[in-house]
UniProtKB/Swiss-Prot annotation:
Keywords: Cytoplasm, Hydrolase, Metal-binding, Nucleotide-binding. Binds 1 divalent metal cation per subunit. The keyword NADP does not apply. It comes from Prochlorococcus marinus (strain MIT 9301). Its cofactor is a divalent metal cation. This is 5'-nucleotidase SurE. Nucleotidase that shows phosphatase activity on nucleoside 5'-monophosphates. One of its GO terms (molecular function) is 5'-nucleotidase activity.
Length: 269
C-alpha cells in the first residue's frame, strides 16, 4: 500500500515507551509519522479540553529518532489532536493512532480514557482513528503490539474504513507465541468498588486519593451482536480484542421503557 500520513498521540505522555514503539512500528512499515502528545502523563482525563490556560508546545524529535517529527503539548490528549489538526500539521492525516496505552481500555472505561478520547477527536474530524492498549500496567514490551496495531489499521484503511467508526484495540499482556486469534468484541460493563483514602496535609486540612478496585464482570457484554464475546473475556483468554465504537451515544434500548414525561410544567395554564 502507499505510505500513509499518520498522526500519533496518547495519554501516557511523550516519554512513554508505548508511543515510541507505535511510532517506530509505523515508520518501519514505510509510513510518514508525526507525533503530538501530552508533555507529561494525562491518563484518565477523558475528553477534557483546556479552556482556562494557554496551550504550549515544545519540539520532541530527539525522543523518537530520525524521520519522526514530534511535539509535546501542555494540554490533554484531545487538545493534542485538535491542535495538531488545526495548527501543527501541514496536511490532514490519513490515519490517527492513539497509544500504545500502558494498561487496558476495556468496556465502560473508555469514557474516562484519554487514549480513546484522542482517537475519538480524530473520528469527530472524519479521520480514521484507532485507540491501542496493552491490557497491563506492568507490561513493558510494546513492539509486537505496535506491529499488530499497524497491521490492523492498514487492513481497515484498505477496506473503506467508515468515517464514523473508531476502533478500540486491546492486546493481551503476554508473549507473542501465547497470543491467540483476534475477534470483534462488544464493550463490557466495567464496574468499580470506589475507595477513597482520606489523609491530612501539614496544615490539618483533609484531602483524598481515589483508588478503585475493578469488580470482574465477564457476563455483561453491553450492546452489540449477541454472538460476539465481551472485550474483557477476550483479554482474559489471551485473545486480541477489537471493538467498533462511534461518537453516537443515543440510547438503543426499547423506546417503551423510557420514562413517561409530560408537558404539564411547560407554560402551565
Amino acid at each position: 500500500m502507499k505510505p500513509l500520513n499518520i498522526l500519533i498521540s496518547n495519554d501516557d505522555g511523550v516519554f512513554a515507551a508505548g508511543i515510541r514503539a507505535l511510532a517506530k512500528s509505523a515508520q518501519k512499515r514505510g509510513h510518514k509519522v508525526k507525533v503530538v502528545c501530552p508533555d507529561q502523563e494525562r491518563s484518565a482525563t477523558g475528553h477534557g479540553l483546556t479552556l482556562q490556560s494557554p496551550l504550549r508546545v515544545e519540539k520532541a524529535d530527539e525522543l523518537f529518532g530520525d524521520g519522526i517529527e514530534a511535539w509535546g503539548c501542555s494540554g490533554t490528549p484531545a487538545d493534542c489532536v485538535k491542535l495538531a489538526l488545526s495548527e501543527l500539521l501541514d496536511n490532514k492525516p490519513d490515519l490517527i493512532l492513539s497509544g500504545i496505552n500502558h494498561g487496558p481500555n476495556l468496556g465502560t472505561d473508555i469514557f474516562c480514557s484519554g487514549t480513546v478520547a484522542a482517537a475519538m477527536e480524530g473520528t469527530l474530524e472524519n479521520v480514521p482513528s484507532m485507540a491501542i492498549s496493552v491490557a497491563s500496567f506492568k507490561w513493558k514490551n510494546f513492539e509486537y503490539a505496535g506491529e499488530i496495531a499497524i497491521n490492523i489499521a492498514e487492513q481497515a484503511i484498505n477496506d473503506n474504513w467508515p468515517a464514523s467508526l473508531l476502533l478500540n484495540l486491546n492486546i493481551p499482556p503476554c508473549a507473542k507465541s501465547k497470543i491467540k486469534e483476534l475477534s470483534w468484541t462488544r464493550l463490557s460493563v466495567r464496574k468499580y468498588k470506589n475507595q477513597f483514602s482520606k489523609r491530612e496535609d501539614p496544615r490539618g486540612d483533609d484531602y483524598y486519593w481515589l483508588a478503585g478496585e475493578v469488580v470482574l464482570d465477564l457476563k455483561s457484554k453491553g450492546y452489540g451482536p449477541k454472538n460476539w464475546p465481551s472485550d474483557v473475556s477476550q483479554i482474559q483468554n489471551n485473545k486480541i480484542s477489537l471493538t467498533p465504537v462511534e461518537p453516537d451515544l443515543f440510547w438503543r434500548g426499547n423506546l417503551d421503557d423510557l420514562p413517561k414525561i409530560n408537558n404539564s410544567f411547560v407554560n402551565p395554564s
